[in-house]
A protein has these predicted regions:
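N-terminal, active-site-proximal structural segment of metallo-dependent hydrolase catalytic domains
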Residues: 2-5, 16-93, 107-109, 267, ...
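Generic enzyme active-site microenvironment
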Residues: 34, 70-71, 154, 185, ...
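Active-site environment of divalent metal-dependent phosphoester hydrolases
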Residues: 39-43, 76-79, 108, 160-162, ...
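Surface-exposed cleft-lining segments at the edges of enzyme active sites
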Residues: 40-46, 130-132, 153-161
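Active-site neighborhood of phospho(di)ester-bond hydrolases with catalytic His/Asp-centered motifs
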Residues: 70-72, 99-104, 183-187, 210-214
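Structured beta-strand-rich core segments of catalytic domains in phosphoester-bond hydrolases
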Residues: 74-150, 245-249
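Metal-dependent phosphoester-hydrolase catalytic domains
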Residues: 130, 173-183, 190-278
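Active-site beta-loop-alpha substructure in enzyme catalytic cores
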Residues: 152, 157-175, 181-184, 188-191
């Protein structure tokens, strides 16, 4: 009887000591993040375009305390979506002071556009910025941001294999000219796991190492081996100047005491990598 009571106490203590999912940064670390927003429609199609969903995604970014962020599936000035500037709205709702940089890659809804974007915490000054436009059945872009210690490229690769290869070549060629370490972050629509259909990843692997978590998938609900397509890469020539501290594909997170399933927020999970510049 005493053993049973003792076991119950131990189990209860174990249950109550389990911490909600949180991801603290190491002191001095810079957190890089890539997140496909699904236009802030929620985790499913058709989803809903509303401010509530924008706030939910922004709260994930706030909880992760990210410093430099690549965001995909953004829209701007679309009449059917309230003529919103989605990247800026996300930034505002985080409550964090970010500089936002948007690449209007493709026309959408008459006078609107869709594209990718980047958010950079304002205590990390942007030295220079370049937007490179990439081939695609849906036109694509890569935002090249030079910071003090590294270059951050935010992109969203095309679904067309041949055009994805062309876009990857442009990014790789540009990165070779850069003296600082280079990160490429985004939904690459490609994977090192795709033995037959991997069109562009072998090109990246010539110049970059994978700097992000590769355990499991980045698309919620997918159990097949090919659903890991969101990455943060680091240039091989710059890896000696960067220490990778931590990286996670974030599937759930604690926000205000509640555990949030991030499959409800977007159809991609966010991926972060914490770095220290040497």
């Amino acid at each position: 009887m005493k053993k049973a009571i003792l076991l119950s106490i131990v189990l209860a203590g174990t249950l109550f000591s389990v911490k909600p999912q949180s991801y603290p940064k190491a002191p001095g670390a810079i957190r890089l993040l890539t997140y496909n927003t699904h236009y802030c429609k929620g985790g499913y199609d058709p989803g809903e375009i509303n401010e509530s969903n924008v706030k939910k995604l922004a709260q994930v970014i706030k909880a992760l305390d990210a410093d430099v962020i690549a965001l995909q599936e953004l829209d701007s000035a679309s009449q059917s979506r309230g003529i919103r500037y989605l990247l800026h709205e996300i930034a505002i709702h985080t409550g964090i002071e970010y500089t936002d940089v948007y690449a209007n890659a493709a026309r959408f809804d008459k006078k609107g556009s869709i594209g990718c974007g980047a958010l950079v915490r304002k205590n990390l000054p942007i030295v220079s910025r370049i937007i490179a436009y990439l081939p695609g059945d849906e036109p694509r872009a890569a935002i090249q941001l030079e910071l003090e210690k590294f270059v951050f490229i935010a992109t969203h690769s095309d679904l067309n294999n041949e055009k994805r290869i062309q876009g990857t070549k442009i990014i790789c060629n540009d990165s070779r000219e850069m003296k600082k370490p280079v990160f490429v972050a985004g939904d690459l629509n490609d994977s090192f796991r795709w033995s037959r259909n991997s069109a562009s990843f072998p090109l990246y692997q010539k110049d970059f190492i994978i700097a992000s978590d590769t355990v499991g998938n980045t698309i919620p609900g997918r159990t097949n081996n090919g659903a890991l397509i969101d990455f943060i890469l680091l240039s091989k020539k710059g890896k000696n100047k960067i220490k990778i501290v931590d990286s996670k594909i974030v599937r759930e997170i604690n926000i205000e005491g509640k555990t949030i399933d991030l499959g409800e927020i977007s159809d991609h999970y966010p991926v972060f990598t914490d770095i220290i510049c040497k």
